[in-house]
Amino acid sequence: MYSVCDVVRDAVAQSHLCACPNDKLPQCKGVTKAPPKCSVFHVAKLQDTKFKWKYTLDPLKAQKLSQIDKDIEKDAITLKLIYGIELSPEDLEWWKMQRCLINKKTGAKGGQFANKYLERQDLELLGYSPTPIIGGDFMFTALPDKVLRTIPVAWDRFLNPAMMIFFLIILLCVILGIFYVLVRNTLRRKQKSKQHQMEIKRFIKEKEQDPYIHTSFESWPADPNKKWKDLIPMYEAQGYCMADYRKKLGMPPGPNC
């Protein structure tokens, strides 16, 4: 029974013939047709194309996806006739197929497509290679294999230049959101601090006017009629009768009446 990796490695082993017939390629001499096993790469490339069309607003989106599904089905039938097993197209995606490749130098399983891995050059010439992780081949010459093998292969799908714009937009939105929250909270704290300071100033002002304010000895409010009450005895001293005024002001009866 064949596994997905068996099929992938089998296809990679003769991938140099997938561009045939092509008179410019020396390996294509006498080859009139690309091997059916190249269907593995066709499916992988179609899966990439399908992924891109899924997230487009193009009016032809539904029509294009339908055609891609039909093409994938044709290649899946071809592979079934060769290997006698039903392969899921979802298993034949570039980032999943990378798990099946082997490092030429060490024999260890390779995590990423790079020139040092099995037949990557042929795949690039055929246009089948996936978009490399950010940094491209430079990353693979600058970092040791042990480091490279720690990079999850799934990152090849998301950490590529074509997709990074979406992640940068999301990151920018997150940063702006955090900045907005910080600014809003700072302004709220300043507003509360300002209100608190105003309350303190008002309390100090009231305290200066009445030292017993807000205590059990708080002074009675000033009498608005005190001025007139002070004038009445003065008029009475001159012999006037101020009984009516005393009554209106709530004062006891006085002389001269």
Curated annotation (Swiss-Prot):
Transmembrane segments: 123-143, 163-183
Induction entry: Expressed in the late phase of the viral replicative cycle.
Membrane topology according to the record: Multi-pass membrane protein
Keyword Protease: no
Disulfide bonds: none
Principal localisation: host cell
Source organism, top-level taxon: Viruses
Family under the similarity heading: Belongs to the asfivirus C257R family.
Protein name: Transmembrane protein C257L
Organism, as annotated: African swine fever virus (strain Badajoz 1971 Vero-adapted) (Ba71V)
